[in-house]
Amino acid sequence: MGDVQSAIERAAFSEHGAQWSISAVDLDTGASVGERDPDACLSTASVGKLLALIELAERVGRGEADLRTVVARTEADRVADSGLWQHLAIEELPLADVAMLIGTVSDNLATNVLLRHLGLGSVHHRAGLLGLSTVQLHDRVRDERTPDDPPRLSSGSARELTGLMRRLRSDGPGLVLDWLRPGTDLSLVASAFGLDPLAHVLVDRGLRVINKTGTNRGVRADVGIVEGPARGLVYAVLVNWTEPATPDDRSRDLVLDAMRDIGSALRATVAGG
C-alpha cells in the first residue's frame, strides 16, 4: 500500500473529530492500495447524483428512454448553488444535455428535472439492483431541509463507491462516464493532478481522470478513476466533520489539504513513481 496508505493515515489526523471513509483500489484487479474505514456510511452530498445518471443510462440501453426527449424545468425544480441551467434563459433541454449538465457541473436544477422525469423510487430501485446498501440518493436537491425532509441528499461508503466506479469502467465506454468525463470540479483529491478543470477530457501529463464530487457544509467527497502510464486506480475519499460558520475556522483548509495529499500519493502511484 505504501505511500497511498501513509497519506490516508495522515488525513485521519488532519482535523480533530472528522470522520473519514477512504478506499483506493487497482482499476484492473480491484486490489486495495489503501483504505480507512471503507465501510463507514457518510453523507456524500452530490455524489449520489451518480445513481440518477445510471438509471437514465440503463433506460436508454434498454430502449426505454430517448436522450433526444425534451424536458422542461418548472418553478418547483428551481434550486440554487451548483449548476448552470439556473443562469440560462432556455426553459427546455433534451435529456442528453440535462445529463451532461449533471455530470459536468453537478447541476442541481437539472438533477431535480431528471429526478422528476425518472421518479426517485426508480433510482432507489436501481441502487438495490446494483447491490448497494450504503450508496443512496435520498431526495431531490433542496435549498433548505425541514424536519419533514430526508436529512441529507445522499450517502455512501468508500468501498461501495469504488466498486461502483470500477464497475462503470469495466463495462467499457458508456454514457455515465461520458457525462462525467468533462467534470469541472478538480478541487478535492483531483487538485493534485495538475489538470485544467475546464479541459481535461484528453490525456494530459500522462494522466486521465474522471470523477464526481460532493460538497456541503461539513461534507467533502471525491470519487473517481485516475489512469497514468504505470496503472489505473479507483478512489473514493469521503469526509464529514462539524464545520463552524466562522471566518477564521481552518477546518475546511485542513480537510482540503489532506485530500490533496491523498491525490498526490495516487498520482505518484499511477505514474510509477
Label the model's feature ranges:
Residues R78-N112, L120:
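Conserved catalytic neighborhood of penicillin-recognizing serine enzymes
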Residues G30, S43-V71, Y235:
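Active-site SXXK
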Residues E35-S43, L84, L88, M100, ...:
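A short glycine/serine-rich beta->alpha loop
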Residues I54-R62, R116, G163-S170, S264-A268:
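Short glycine/serine- and small hydrophobic-enriched flexible loop segments
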Residues M1-E9, V33, R169-D196, V203-G206, ...:
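Structured C-terminal helix/loop/strand segments within mature extracytoplasmic catalytic/sensor domains
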Residues M1-S43, A265:
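Beta-lactamase-like hydrolase cores
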Residues H16-W20, L115-G172:
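Mid-domain, small-residue-enriched loop/turn segments at the edges of structured enzyme/sensor domains
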Residues R62-L88:
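Short, glycine/proline-biased beta-turn/loop segments that scaffold the active-site neighborhood
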